[in-house]
Amino acid sequence: VQFLSTAQLLLTTLVVKLAIIAVLSTMLVRFQQFRRILLTEQRAWRERLVFAFMLGIPLVGGVAARLLLNYNAADFLLAGPFLAGLLAGPYAGAIVGTLLGSPALIGGEVGAMPFAVGCGFAGGGIREVCPKEAIWHLSPLFFTDLHRHAWQVVSRFKVDWLLLLAAAPVGLELIRQGVGLRFGTNAIFFYQPDSLLMAALIALSTVLSVAIPIKIWNTARIEHRLQEQDTLLMEARVDALANQINPHFLFNTLTSISSLIRSQPETARTLILKLSTMLRRMLRTQEHF
């Protein structure tokens, strides 16, 4: 007995798909090494490989789940390589595309690997021409300002990177739909909409599959930068306080010690020991900050 219609089942699959990518992105950003890679835009080859495999290996499980269990919600054959290329360069995107396309190719989908690798190179190509910070501005709520960005393109004849970042996954999804309709599901897996509304929702879910991880990871980047700023601010405050207090404090203390050396040598010795202990403690505190 089928409790859901075809459209309802497809809509549920798309919602679960977005939940899966959100959970996976949150789990990955908890790893210190993965977070450290996100903080730098100029990455070495080793960091790109680590990023590609840390993102690609869990996504391979999603493709395998679709092939073995017929569970379509965990398939990110398009969004995964595109996201890797967008954040780590074309070769990282191609590596993720190869990882995700391999089980699909083994399962008989001959067009899966070329398409996935192409998505990786597409994301990497956009990264090469797009300002790096513009990538991090892509948000799951991009469509709320879409009309304003479209008007800027029309009125100023200037490239709007948000529109490009949102349009690229839509274009790739249309290519996948076209290839799937032409050659069938034996060539490549694709969601089959029964109306224009469902086709639009499929395209929207593809963009959100890219935008949600970027939003989650950008939040982690901002939190790390705020922590660094708080640490630097605390260091500056400690240094300013030490520079303000130490000269007067030392002058008064040394004056008192000099007057006690002849009359009360034991008291002067005690003051010197306390002063040295206090200065050592202040030095350790500054080194700690």
PLM region spans:
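Hydrophobic transmembrane alpha-helices
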Residues: 2-82, 92-93, 97-194
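Alpha-helical transmembrane segments of polytopic membrane proteins
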Residues: 9-19, 108-119, 191-204
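Juxtamembrane or sensor-core-proximal signal-transducing alpha helices
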Residues: 24, 28-37, 126-137, 175-188, ...
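Non-cytosolic membrane-interface motifs at loop->transmembrane helix junctions
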Residues: 74-80, 187-197
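"Short basic amphipathic alpha-helical interaction patches in structured regions
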Residues: 76-80, 96-100, 282
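A short glycine-centered flexible hinge/capping loop motif at secondary-structure junctions
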Residues: 88-89
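Two-component histidine phosphotransfer core
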Residues: 193-289
